[in-house]
């Protein structure tokens, strides 16, 4: 578990540094969004209200930082941001208590060792403590659709939970020794079967299957309970060709391509939700990257609002 946490921290630190060097061109898009938040405040709407609120589906609790919750709350207040805080099982009490004290800022999610003999009991305990879902599931030894994982999915289905899965390429943490890790076990195509077998689970895929964006998008298109984020390296490596995503999220949701979407939004990009997967200092840069994508792909304002928070607010029934 410690190796896993180290890998996650290293990845977020690296991606945060990489993204920070590529975002000057997108500052204008975020500036407009930030202005809308300021206008909301001037209209007498408190920062903790749902108006203009960002919901970040991909914030990893960092147990190595004793002031992490306090530091997060400062960022949360400044950006008007709520986090689905992905929490190691051993840190569940800290985050559960923080979520009780700050219900409009922290939504507790737990990740468990799928190979622990008491993993189902761990899931049940998280549920009893008020956790709202699982994530980020990753570094699995078998594909996500392996029946050995089904008892966990069955509990999540029973609870109507949201479950976040890593999808796509994954970093390599060890170079001089064998490592039982393979991206092929975490391909986005596996999420289709989970979504169909367990229809009460809302399936979130991190990183939009990087680099299998086409598979991720088509699975999200035909499964109303599947969404993806674009955290990680995608918006950095695609910064000069962001409009390419219009060819991936291509459908209109009308006519022969009509599918069930949040609020019947016909824009294909509504199947994306915001996720940062970076350090606290890097979240604002990822927001800018999303807005650069919106501008490049001419995503309409109502769809932008759903991506940045509206969809998850409705799915989770978050307080205002």
Which ranges hold each PLM region?
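Conserved, mostly hydrophobic/aromatic
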Residues: 156, 228, 304
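Hydrophobic faces of well-ordered beta-strands that scaffold small-molecule active sites
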Residues: 55-59, 83-86, 108-110, 134-135, ...
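Mid-to-C-terminal alpha-helical segments outside catalytic/metal-binding sites
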Residues: 2-57, 66-83, 93, 258-273, ...
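Histidine/acidic-residue-rich catalytic or RNA/ligand-binding cores of hydrolases
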Residues: 65-69, 95, 173-177, 213-222, ...
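Alpha-helical scaffolding within the catalytic cores
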Residues: 42, 68, 90-97, 118-122, ...
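His/Asp/Glu-enriched short active-site or ligand-binding loop at hydrolase and phosphoryl-transfer sites
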Residues: 227-240
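Active-site gating/metal-coordination segments in enzymes
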Residues: 90-185, 234-235
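Acidic (Asp/Glu)-rich catalytic clusters
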Residues: 46-50, 73-78, 95-105, 122-130, ...
